[in-house]
Structures are given as structure tokens and as C-alpha cells.
Amino acid sequence: MPAAKVCVLLLALVGTGLLSACGGTGPNFVAKDEPWREAEERSCVASGVVHETAFIRSRSALGGPSVCGAEHPFEMSAADGGRIRLKPAALLRCPMIPQVDRWISTVVAPAAIHAYGVPLAEITVAASYGCRPMNNVSGAMLSEHGHANALDVSGFILADGTRITVKKGWKGDVRERTFLRRVHDGACEEFTTVLGPNYDSNHRDHFHVDLARRGKTGLNRVCK
């Protein structure tokens, strides 16, 4: 095969179950074939737990390259019954929608009232769907963002215009620190992965949350 064409190594032949792209313009990440993703997504859609509204819209299937994508993604532009905006709108797979909504409505919004006495108005979305390796490091494993199974949040805007960013507020004043730690710690109850500034420099300016399956049961959690 010419070098300019995508070369896919079926490492599953040696028992790893991994797919790795090589050469030319092919994917720059290592991916794993995980049948549970498709089954979980279809089950979520069939359950009706996510339905279309003015702020949750069904979108066309996301596909490729490699195993990137989602069969039934949704675009989420607001949470908590439309009261709290997500800007820009997040493109996510079905199982992420109710978790994000619950986190925002039961954790983030109350944290704003607790720390500032002001309602939360908007969430600043740093990333949702994106077919790329973890931390954008070429050759790394495919990020959960590549499955529309992750959300990065970099900031929050209150109803009075107050802006709190993860980058400045994590070590900011008392109210910023109180608010952001409640938001971070509360996320650990809703998602299997939560990464923030204490994890590494790649997350110094945002919170990463996802629903990756970890461990033999798929229920292991990472909260850092």
C-alpha cells in the first residue's frame, strides 16, 4: 500500500484489540474497538431519557476517521430546563446529556448560590466532540472526546455578569475557590472521569468530565 494511504494495523491479531493508524494523513491516535459504546448509546436513545427540546436537538450521526463518532448525537445548548446556557453548544452522545444536565442543575447552580448568592446563567464550553488523541498528543489513545463522550468546561457566568474561570479562579479568592471546588467535587458523583487543575498542566484551565468505562466492571472512577 502506498505510504500516502491510510495504513491500519490490526493489533487485535496479537490480542490487544487496538487499532492504530500509520502513515500519511491517517488518524494520529491509537483506538480500541469497544462494542459496549454502540449498545449503550442505542439503549439510551430507546429509553427516551433524552428527548428533543428547544435546547436539546438531535443531530446527524458522527463518523470517522477510525472509531470516532456517535450514532445518535445531540446538540445541547442549555441545561436545567433551558435556564442555564451552554456556549458554544455541546455535541454529545445520548448518555452524557442527562449526566451533564444533572451536574449543572444539582451541583453547579447551587454552588453559585452558595458562593455568590447569584444564579448561574451560562457555562463556557471549551470542548465536546472532537476526533483527536488524549491531550492532543500524537500517537496517544483516542480521547473520549472522539466518542462525543466528554465535555470540557472552562468557565461560568452568573446572572449579574460575574465571570469565574477555572484558570484564574482555581487559586483565586475565597469565593472562586469555594465555588470551583464544589463544582469539581460534585462532578465526581456524576461522571466516571473528572480531571482538573490538580491533575496536570493540560487541565490547568478547564474541568474535563466523561463517562468512560474503567476496570473490569466499567465502574471504576477517576477524580483528580
Task: Label every PLM stretch briefly.
Residues 25-30, 142, 149-151, 155-224:
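Catalytic cores and adjacent binding grooves of peptidoglycan-active enzymes
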Residues 57-68, 121-133, 201-207, 212-213:
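Acidic helix-start/capping segments at beta-turn-to-alpha-helix junctions
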Residues 31-38, 91-103, 174-178:
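Soluble non-cytosolic domains of exported or imported proteins
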Residues 1-22:
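Sec-dependent bacterial lipoprotein signal peptides
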Residues 23, 40-45, 67-69, 93-95, ...:
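Sequence contexts marking disulfide-bonded cysteines in secreted/extracellular proteins
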Residues 16-40:
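Bacterial Sec signal peptide processing site at the extreme N-terminus
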Residues 114-148:
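Active-site-adjacent substructure of cysteine-protease-like catalytic cores
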Residues 43-123:
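Active-site acidic/histidine clusters and adjacent loop/turn architecture
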